[in-house]
Amino acid sequence: MDAYEYSELIKELENKIENIESILKPEKLEARLKEIEELENSPDFWNDPKTSAKVQKEKNAILRKLEKYKKAKTALQDNKDMFELASMEEDEETLNEVFNDVQDLKKIIRDLEIEVMLSDENDAKNAIISIHPGAGGTESHDWASILYRMYLRYAERRGWKVEVLDYQAGDEAGIKDVSFLVKGENAYGYLKAENGIHRLVRVSPFDSGGRRHTSFASVQVSPEIDDDIEIEIDPKDIRIDVFRASGAGGQHVNKTESAVRITHIPTGIVVGCQTDRSQHKNKDMAMKMLKSKLYELELEKRKAEEEGKPKDEMGWGHQIRSYVLFPYQQVKDNRSNKAYSRVDDILDGDLDEVIEDVLIAEKEHEN
């Protein structure tokens, strides 16, 4: 990097900080923190645990955003000051240090951009993910299990917790169906980018002829809804089946006659839960999953109407990403239009860059 490239990058980063400031509105956030402080000083505030917990969550989110914003702004100014000083003194060693540091600064500001983007009320929620293999038997069942492992590893990298809700093993390999809850900071905000059809192209390990196969699996992501969100479901619209828990879902899946599957007849949505020995608790969780999916479907519908999208682009039914393992190696996302060659890393859960590129592309599309 030379002085010209540095100054161009600094201009770009300054513009980003200005844009972030206009969206974040730090003064308003500081004012809201003072309001929360006044609320906390009232004894009545703590008498309502539900409300106080909600406000505490809001406070922590504000503090996190302000801290990241201040850190980025200060680091940018410090870097510029150091560059000016090193330039005046013609200190090559310090200049190289400044050029290296500005790359780290780029990453800090990108993280802040993503944080600001995840400001929708649902982004902070936990995420419920369901993976359904497409047609193709063992091939697609195996592909579903590869995706499942990818998300488990991604959650692990981000420090999120995972709770398996429903797991049906494939007859020969892989999985027929899996649903799991991801708990963590902005879990839905990040994972909503995974909603859609995922396509795999590879030489099949199950084909003795070594032929190339294409497999599909759909990933559905819904925010775990709070109890205070009202979703009306007519009992006549659902069918409830009870069965014995099955599959290799790990130690969290029990083996008693308590697994519950609920079918929502008008939409065809099917949800299941088999984590608890209590049929009653599994039914409650399955109903929560159904409500979350109906809520997500309604959000998609409203978004599509606002953007004037045709009906066939709504919901979970469109292809979003291809993973090609043969004849070359590449992951290509249809929304960001970006391609990545580090396929093994991505399938091992290194998804941050891929997801962030999607979030940025979608934000630019909105604007």
Swiss-Prot record:
Where is this gene product found? Cytoplasm
Q: List cellular component terms (GO).
A: cytoplasm
- Return the SMART domains for the record: PCRF
Keyword line: Cytoplasm, Methylation, Protein biosynthesis
N5-methylglutamine sites (modified residues): Q251
What one GO molecular function would you report for this record? translation release factor activity, codon specific
What range does the record give for the signal peptide? none
PTM comment for this protein? Methylated by PrmC. Methylation increases the termination efficiency of RF2.
> What PANTHER family does the record point to?
CLASS I PEPTIDE CHAIN RELEASE FACTOR, PEPTIDE CHAIN RELEASE FACTOR 2
The function of this protein is: Peptide chain release factor 2 directs the termination of translation in response to the peptide chain termination codons UGA and UAA.
User: Which family is annotated?
Assistant: Belongs to the prokaryotic/mitochondrial release factor family.
Task: Write the protein's name.
Answer: Peptide chain release factor 2
| Species, as recorded | Nautilia profundicola (strain ATCC BAA-1463 / DSM 18972 / AmH)
